Amino acid sequence: MVIITILLILFQLNKVFADNIQLPDSHAPISVMGDHTHKKKEVMFSYRFMNMQMGKLFNNNKKLSKDAVMSAPNGASDGSGSYMNTPKSMSMDMHMFGMMYAPSNRITLMLMNSFLEKEMTQQRMRMAGGANFDVNSSGFGDLKASALITLLNETNWENSFLLGVSLPTGSIDKRGRTPASNNTRLGYGMQNGTGTYDTYFLINNLNTIDKFKIGEQIHF
């Protein structure tokens, strides 16, 4: 009975103080990038970690078997040959570093880069024995620079857009040991960079309705 009474008291205390709880809702979930702006001269540094595990092959939304991949025409040989290897699984650890600085209340500048650690297990074609082998790569990816511009900053409605460019600072010549050679240039998925300049654009919208916040982010 004493335990029940104590639990009831704690429950009542939680109800009393519930209206004064400070919620961490000034930022979107950690996987959402470029969601908020800063006040003039504010600086923020960030670190995010993400792990990805991949193990299936698709052509659009159609799942492919490993035999189907290795029997498909190889574009590198003008379609006259087939693929000698196929991916079986891949893991990637991504360490993301970011910095934000606001030169004014309306504009927030952003820099982002990532350190990537990749490992892929591949399978040889049956005529070559069908054995598995692993390839690895690591290094920094492409540098992203962007500007986040506030369009609207009202009590119940916030709106902003981001313009950014991706600079090809990541390596596209990672090499490793494979059954073919001890210094083979690895496939596109194992490279750290894209080798191209790319632009990107997104729009943020945040509405506050009573105690609820609803946000959307659209990428282009």
Language model regions located:
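Aromatic-anchored, glycine/proline-accented short structural segments
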Residues: Y197-F220
